[in-house]
Amino acid sequence: DVYKRQAWEMTDMFNLKAIEVIARSLRDAVENKPEGREGMALGQYLTGMGFSNCGLGIVHSMAHGLGALYDTPHGVANAIILPTVMEYNAPCTGTKFKDIAIAMGVEGVENMTQEEYRKAAVDAVKKLSADVGIPADLKAIVKEEDLGFLSESAFADACCPGNPRDT
């Protein structure tokens, strides 16, 4: 939500802090450690403060369809879709992926080119997802015959217009 069309300084502050807290807490939360669960509670609150003031994008639009059709938990659906959508949206994000990479705990970001820190941010998201057992792509849950419905429902979803890159 850091790079949505309506994002601004305040929403970036909330969302980047949420990314930082979630990146450091999710693994422990999955292991049911109290400090991880507490961190995730804070992270979801912070990101809620961010996206409630700037909206959401195509990741959430697509996740809604997966939840409706396959009963995929919303967080899992978002995590599966997020890296691909990050790559798609990267040309419209300026330097925001640099901030995301830093929030995800990537080291050496200050010395990276734009292409390198964008890739590092996406790779950090992929690693976090893999570490907690999230499937790497939609093939794990989506049937090919459902792609038409999923595509149509994503474009019709209220979150779609908030995407920073036209869809």
Annotate each language-model stretch with its function.
Residues 97, 107-167:
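C-terminal charged capping/lid subdomain of soluble metabolic enzymes
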Residues 9-20, 56, 76, 91-94, ...:
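Alpha-helix N-cap/helix-start motif at coil-to-helix transitions, marked by capping-box chemistry
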Residues 1-54:
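Carboxylate- and glycine-rich phosphate/diphosphate-binding segment that chelates Mg2+/Mn2+
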Residues 45-78, 157-161:
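Glycine-rich phosphate/pyrophosphate-binding beta-alpha loops
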Residues 65-104:
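Catalytic phosphate/nucleotide-handling subdomain of diverse soluble enzymes
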Residues 1-10, 95-103, 130-133:
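A glycine/threonine-rich phosphate-anchoring loop and its flanking beta-alpha core
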Residues 27-39, 98-105, 109-116:
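C-terminal helix-coil-helix/basic helical segment that borders enzyme active sites and/or dimer interfaces
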